[in-house]
Amino acid sequence: MPELAKTYDPVGTEARWQQAWEDQGAFHPDPKAPGEPFSVVIPPPNVTGSLHMGHAFNTALIDTIVRYQRLAGKNVLCLPGTDHASIAVQTILEKQLKQEGKTRHHLGRDGFLERAWQWKAESGGRIVGQLRRLGYSVDWQRQRFTLDEGLSEAVKEAFVRLHEQGLIYRGEYLVNWCPASGSAVSDLEVEMKEVDGHLWHFRYPLSSGDGHLEVATTRPETMLGDTAVAVNPTDERYAHLVGQTLTLPFVGREIPIVADDHVEKDFGTGCVKVTPAHDPNDFAIGQRHGLPQITVMRKNGTMNKEAGQFEGLDRFEARKAVVAGLDELGLLVKVEDYRHSVPYSDRGKVPVEPLLSTQWFVRTEPLAARCREALEKQDPRFIPERWEKVYRDWLTDIRDWCISRQLWWGHRIPAWFVISETGGKYTDTTPYVVARNEVEALEKAKAKYGAAAVIEQDEDVLDTWFSSGLWPFSTLGWPDAESADLQRWYPTSTLVTGFDIIFFWVARMTMMAGAFTGEMPFQDVYIHGLVRDEQNRKMSKSAGNGIDPLLLIDRYGTDALRFALVREVAGAGQDIRLDYDRKTDTSATVEASRNFANKLWNATRFALMNLGDETPAQLGDPDPAALQLADRWILSRLARVNRETAERYSNYGLGEAAKGLYEFAWNDVCDWYLELSKRRLNPGENPSAEALADQRVAKQVLAKVISQMHQMLHPLMPHLTEELWHSVTGKSETTFLALQPWPALQESALDDALEASFADLIGAIRVVRNLRAVAGLKPSQSVPVRFVTGRGELAAVLNQGTADITALTRAESVAVMAPAEADAAPVAKALAGVSGELQVLLPIEGLVDLDALKGRLEKDIAKAEKEIKGLAGRLGNPNFADKAPPEVVAECQANLDEKQAQADLARKRLADLS
């Protein structure tokens, strides 16, 4: 068998196995291969992006799931890909052009797109390379990009079909408009920011001259587009005014006073200015009352001719000018400081404007209805279940989806305007045809408008989420219903994603899938939480607390980071915390996982040194009749952990699986079984035939436990376990642990009573070790040990384990007694300890300086009493007990209880020695 290096080199090991898996096509499944299908399409990161901790967390969860399913015998496809990220890429390129003194219009559409593809080729692979470093067991040969030819055809097909069904239409509606990028943006691309602004109160005079109404707004510049003032129909203060008109300052327009239930009569003055062309709520009021929609702002953020004297001013300059003008007219009542949420363009980094614009929309209600119906059958199933309500609420309270963007990089809308019908130019009244390509479009145009029809394709592109919504099935070959991948792996098995895009991505995928495949696109939706810092703050660029995963990977290794992230999960969907020292680029949490990796490495080296040249297969299974107590215990633990871990992996209990395996590997295997096996693995010179037979049994058990431990840990720490498993099994480098079956569960090995009794034996050994430390015994000193218990089964286990106890405690002798027997032969000058129902006595007279030991105990008591006094005083202080955070008070009480217990124990030991 190959020899393991003394120390673990994670970076070199990980790179080698990643290359080996890829070279051998380990994760490139054949759709015709046997096994139940299991498929996951990864959420496609933007090509502009770089790896952040959210990606690392998502990857760790997905890869743990798919690697287990592979071990469980499934035919697994994990399909990777990237998103073209229309706005993000275009923003980057336009910034580059600006530095060159150019705009995209200098290049023209074709030239700009050529540059975009060149940029994608040069820079777009960065995040893919970073994802590879995470050890993703995906099929890189099936990697997709949302602008790939096949996916582009799927997008066109989807658009055409939805249009033919009347579910895509063109109309003028309010959209989020980013003046910086000159495009409509989706709700997801809008970030709400808390800002310190103002609330301006001003009066609108009644046209009759008999008074005024007072309104308030955070956007005074929009008042130029007001077409009404609304009051609540039950508000008696204004009931007599409904139907009258007000005169709008500056423009002199008369606007009606309308009654609408949207108005809260107890908020402010109970009067709301209505600007249908610049506010979504006002737009709805305007629709209900047939109000005109007056746009006062251009798409570049300057005021238009409808703004009268303010035409040409930037929107923020206009705000100041309008306020100053109202003040001059005596209409400004007051200005209040006001902290409120303002929608910002995520890409343009400027406040967005709700603007009326002619755009393409998807009629979402018919699509959402199909999803709601499926959800009644838990299709898909949400983990945790609480997110199902969030998903249902989004599908219930839904608006039509604006899918057009005024950009060049992206899926160009497959619609052609018949410009020959409007004098050879595009106008708002130009008719259009929708088609899969220009040839089909021209045929449709000629059929409808005559042979002389001239067409011109829409300049706009589709919202990135349109193509992302097709991701689960377009990547598998749709619209080709005969696609082998589509037939084998669709619907997909599990979607793993964050809660923040349940509507923006999850719901759009289910709506699209329902429309085009008649099925929901995934069976399960696993919603994970956020990665937070040590202060429980969400990690983000704006907070400046993000962590570059590659820094931690370079320092500790990919497996250490992955294991740390998954182990932190306290339950499906829960946020996790990750500490990080920015001065040293270190993380205690990830370092602990690296130490665990080193522990596994050293345990495997120990096994290799003791197994000789025999592999687990060559050693075979031990004879059950020849098993020692420790063997039966560790094999029972192995079977139990096997069963629990498989259940946890299968049911998304990934954090619980990681914690359970950590405890098993570190405590049961490394701390106890390896220590207990040492004397048997090294029987000394001229061993007896019985000792040699027992040595072989110990080797057989050790080989089985170590190799299966590697298998069970593989989904969590794939590179490390692949390396260690190969070293133990001697398999060739083209035979992968990643593709082996999950270890068979040995039900017959399970023994609840034995595990409970052995836990008592471990407790007894711990107490003896602790008493030796209290006494200050040297490691070379042997001392008799006396155990006292009234439990017969515990006494039997202690008697069976006498040799183990002697070896691990350096006991001179071990005596197991019943209470009556111990009372009949009392021991003087002994240290006593307790473990459950077991009393442990360590006679030390003649072995240590009793006076010195008593002196140490008296010092311990004095120190504890001083700390007790301080803690009790703190808790007795009302300023602390009543005002400190509850968790701080609870921690103080716990410290007090601990110190009191320590003092009581020291007093008892002092009394025993007196």
From Swiss-Prot:
Coiled-coil residues are 847-914
Per the UniProt record, one Pfam family is: tRNA-synt_1
GO MF annotation, one: ATP binding
The UniProt comment on domains reads: ValRS has two distinct active sites: one for aminoacylation and one for editing. The misactivated threonine is translocated from the active site to the editing site. The C-terminal coiled-coil domain is crucial for aminoacylation activity.
Q: What does this protein do?
A: Catalyzes the attachment of valine to tRNA(Val). As ValRS can inadvertently accommodate and process structurally similar amino acids such as threonine, to avoid such errors, it has a 'posttransfer' editing activity that hydrolyzes mischarged Thr-tRNA(Val) in a tRNA-dependent manner.
Q: How does it assemble?
A: Monomer.
Indicate the family of this protein: Belongs to the class-I aminoacyl-tRNA synthetase family. ValS type 1 subfamily.
Its recorded name reads Valine--tRNA ligase
Gene name in the database record: valS
